[in-house]
A protein has these predicted regions:
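A helix-coil-helix interface module used to build multimeric assemblies
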Residues: 1-216, 220-231, 294, 307-309, ...
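Active-site-adjacent "gating/activation" loops or surface patches in catalytic cores
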Residues: 223-247, 251
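Amphipathic, heptad-repeat alpha-helical segments used for oligomerization and assembly
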Residues: 240-261, 336, 340, 420-423
């Protein structure tokens, strides 16, 4: 293994430990492992088809041997495949030759060795392997890590549901909310995208060189190949069968999947920037870790580095995922090879996503609300009550309510409780309504924010 300090990519260097869970999935070893699984499961279903008499049904012993190779495929095995590829200059053919050699001592497989990779084009193996890799990454890494963020944010939304804060629209003071409600907004957005990721289909095909079962039909015209291949893709591999393809599976589902990940990333970039701003305003403080340095020259600094790191990595992820989404569904005629090298970078987009998730969660775990700063902002901005006052005036038929509050508050400095009190007392509205307005403060003017935050 290369020394991480000498790695070209930071994913395998500085950030290697943070993306360790992805390495067995998206590395070249991971691709080989998936190819072995596809090739051997294809051989198993050929042997189980009575009309393919040249491959008798495998015994339980042979099936167990096949499963053992699938489950124990190792780095040493991968190195042996690479050694074969040095001669073949073809990665999928190297897998086929390695399998023939590996099973030379298993009589039933050795007798049927020419049915390894039977009627397959390389892309039949590759497209299914890529689908398995993406599915594993979703189940083992992406969804659990996203669920962890959602769980953390949900807890924060509940905990901070009643902490009032001044909103800002266009960067200017606006109707109050609560910290918890603003976090709940993000939770809801992420929950929707989580469901989209869960529902994503992973498509596959094994229909030959141009998608028409040409070789299959010549060799065994009596086999219902479409049903056979559908069952293999859906039952043996747990994927979704694509019945209409060229040589390659068209990768539309990949574009959908990468775009779904990108939407999650975009939501987190948005929230990273908001939290960065709230820290700058003093609404949140950050827990200080002993020994850490915030600046090489300014000893006092406690910077929002986790949210900045998250934003940067998620931006990198979206750049890669965006290119994958745009490029992969495009292939000249029945295929060209431009997708092959691009597909080797799936793990890069997912890797930067995982880095962004991890940094965001680290940042969340350092946050502490600063009620004093929140309260001070609200108490200095009584003009926020212009909205409820003019709305109540509308209810009771007071003429030109909006315009009167605009004249009183817009662009004015030092709108005090006393100024608003005098204005309210001058209104010709029912005493009960007047009393409610006089009781109102910016910190109390939060509508259903607390309830909404606790309900998420």
């Amino acid at each position: 293994m290369i020394n991480p300090i000498a790695a070209l990519s930071p994913l395998d260097g500085r950030y290697a430990k943070s993306v360790e869970a992805l390495r067995p999935i998206f590395s070249e070893y991971g691709l080989m492992r998936a190819r072995v699984k596809v090739e051997l499961n294809w051989l198993k279903v050929l042997a189980a088809e009575p009309k393919i008499v040249e491959v008798p049904a495998f015994s339980d012993f042979t099936l167990a041997e096949i499963d053992k190779v699938i489950e124990t495929f190792s780095l040493e095995d991968a190195a042996a495949v690479k050694a074969i590829e040095a001669t073949t200059n073809h990665d999928v053919k190297a897998i086929e030759y390695w399998l023939k050699e590996r099973f030379s001592g298993v009589p039933e497989v050795a007798a049927a060795s020419e049915f390894i990779h039977f009627a397959c084009t390389s892309e039949d193996i590759n497209n299914l392997s890529h689908a398995l890799m993406l599915q594993e990454a979703r189940e083992a890494v992406l969804l659990p890590k996203l669920a962890e963020i959602i769980e953390k944010l949900t807890g924060m939304a509940h905990e901070l549901a009643a902490v009032p804060m001044m909103s800002r629209t266009h960067g200017q003071p606006a109707t109050p909310s609560t910290l918890g409600k603003e976090i709940a907004n993000v939770v809801y957005r992420l929950q929707r995208q989580f469901k989209n990721l869960q529902a994503q289909e992973f498509l596959g095909k094994i229909n030959g060189a141009v998608g028409n079962y040409n070789a299959h039909m010549v060799a065994y015209p009596d086999v219902d190949w479409e049903t056979h291949c559908r069952n293999f893709v859906e039952i043996s591999l747990g994927l979704t069968f694509n019945p209409y393809t060229i040589q390659i599976e068209p990768h539309d589902y990949m574009a959908e999947f990468f775009q779904a990940i990108s939407r999650v990333n975009t939501i987190l970039v948005d929230f990273n920037r908001d939290v960065w701003g709230y820290i700058s305003l003093g609404y949140f403080k950050q827990k200080v870790k002993a020994g850490e340095v915030g600046s090489s020259t300014m000893p006092h600094k406690v910077n929002p580095i986790d949210f900045e790191n998250s934003e940067g990595n998620l931006g990198m992820a979206n750049a890669v995922l965006g290119f994958l989404s745009e490029k992969l569904p495009i292939s000249r005629w029945q295929r060209d090879l431009t997708d092959s090298t691009v597909l080797r970078n799936m793990g890069v987009g997912v890797g930067y996503t995982v880095l962004g998730f991890a940094a965001h969660l680290r940042g969340l775990n350092k946050l502490e609300p600063n009620p004093a700063a929140l309260a001070a902002d609200l108490d200095a901005t009584w003009e926020l009550l212009a909205e409820p006052i003019q709305t109540v005036m509308r209810r009771y038929g007071v003429a030109n309510p909006y315009e009167k509050l605009k004249d009183l508050t817009r662009g004015k400095d030092g709108i005090t409780p006393e100024v608003l009190k005098l204005f309210i007392e001058s209104l010709e509205i029912p005493a009960e309504a007047k009393a409610k307005l006089l009781e109102l403060t910016p910190a109390l003017y939060v509508g259903k924010a607390e309830e909404l935050a606790k309900r998420i």
